[in-house]
Amino acid sequence: PTSVTESALTRNHTELMLKFFGAELESKETSVTIWPATELFGNRIDVPGDISSSVYFVAAGLILPNSEVLIKNVGINPTRAGLIKVCEAMGADLTLLNENHGNAEPTADLLVRTSSLKACTIEGDIIPTLIDELPTIAMMACFAEGTTVIRDAAELKVKESNRIAIMVENLRAMGADVEETEDGMIIHGGKP
């Protein structure tokens, strides 16, 4: 067998797909072991919607008055679904419907209703599970009551551009009260 140990927990889409096609592998936290396969088998794949693409509709549904938005068949893989946890921490009215764990990837329909959001702290192990959603989450925090702190997101400074600085600049351009920090930002809500 071949074993790989990573320094941090990462997305597990490849491991799930290989198992779905019959590969023998074992995942434990940051380690994956795979045994040689003589044959993999085809299987029907239902490709779910990307949670990163759904974040805009989630945000609109939470912020716009008298909204109810249903987003069908969204991937809710725990290595990617930090958005759901942050929405829960912010007091969002977000419900998972029709959860399905029978495919290679877990899916659900997301039902979102207008909510009075509250500030929260977003840090640590959840950051890699929502790194692509952070710009929209930061915008949502502008509408939340209280001060939202985002930290441990220094990775955003070294992607295609310094996304922390760009987020802060754009949030300020729309009138938000936001401070840039070394590895994230502080957003004082109630001032979109």
Sequence positions of predicted segments:
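Short, structured segments at the rim of ligand-binding sites
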Residues: 1-192
